[in-house]
Amino acid sequence: MNIVSRIPTDRDSSLVMAKVYEEPRKIPYWEQALISVWFLNSFVPLPLETPLRYLMVLWFLWLLALHKEQVIPIVLKAWPLFLLPIFGFISILWSPYMGAAIRSGALYLLTPLVAVIIITRFDITTILRCMFFAGVMAIIVCIPFYDSMPSGGPYPQKHYFAQQILFVALLSFMTLLNEKSWPWTRLLAALIFPVALIFMLRAPSATALVFAGVGIIGLFLVKFAWQSISKVRHLRSIIFIAGVSVFLIGAMIVLNQTHQDYVADFLGALGKDTTFTGRTHIWSAGRLAAEEHPIIGLGLEGFWNPSNGAAQSINEMDFKPYGTKLTFHNAYLEVRVHLGYIGLGLYLLMWAWCGYRLLMQFFRDSSLEMSALLVFGAIVFISTFTESLAWASFNTPLNLLYLGALATLSPVRRTYVGKAPVYLSSSPGYAKA
């Protein structure tokens, strides 16, 4: 309670006007367990994964029916998240593979809806804690795959595995740094964090290792520097503007040195080449496919299908078995091929909305949770240029992006009710109610 005015009554007592708050509901442990299982399903492949996912979706739809008065207003506030999935669902009308397109369209539409339902029932602190528990379980599930981790472990490709374990490592590090976390969860995070790093090293993905370094440094700086800086008026804004200025000056210097190939030098230091491990060839094929229907695209599931000769040519070029469902390793190209320039515009709008909310939440509340959400969002954004995970359904990067952008829309928080008079009686040296 915050006392705002004091009304004296006699020498030893007084009336005060106090702010009254309503505490949020306590979230049952069984709900937290279910949501942890949902996140685990997106972290790592499980036995009976598809039936489990459909059962969980039915539970979410049941929650939607029970709490539609809370869910629908948040859906309306988060409308940029739904425009692309809606257009994708409409694209089944011109997709050459309608059956597969209907399934994918439903999953794309359910992905942001489930995120809204989760944020309606849980606060962001509980969500991140459940994601951490899911990450712990994912590490346990991955232990039997230790020898096959260099080729992907439980995943068909190593970079998928490395990126999932990357988020486990960052969630563990965030929990370890967070003084508000339960003591035993911080101890568990201290055990899981190095194990996650070892698993990442077993799957030699240069991208994931770079993201891990950036994320760890970012969380460390927020914890021990940014939160102290935020206590000084306007200092954060000054540092932010100075940082942007330094970045722009550095970019100008690099761009003016045309005789230097910094990208090739950087990739060489990571053991990569300028084709990004063959991705440039796939990007060229994707650009050709996008030109077939530049405005509305091929429709969902219109390219990566065993019956599509162009897709199988890419498999052959990439030394993959016939029928392998690859990606273009670029989320924007993926959207452009399947949904054209209209879909690409809606995708960029979604990113603009998510980025704006993540930044505004961070500047208004520089807590470790909000800072971690900004770091996660930045990692997912950068990954869109070399991976297609941010153009998919029900995966960890999208969960972190959507839930991070929706964090402050959660109704599960302490709410201001009003003011009430409170009578206080005091003894010499102290006051008591």
Residue spans for each PLM region:
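Alpha-helical transmembrane segments of multi-pass inner-membrane proteins
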Residues: 111-113, 122-150, 155-226, 357
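Long extracytoplasmic/lumenal interhelical loops at the membrane interface
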Residues: 270-284, 288, 296-339
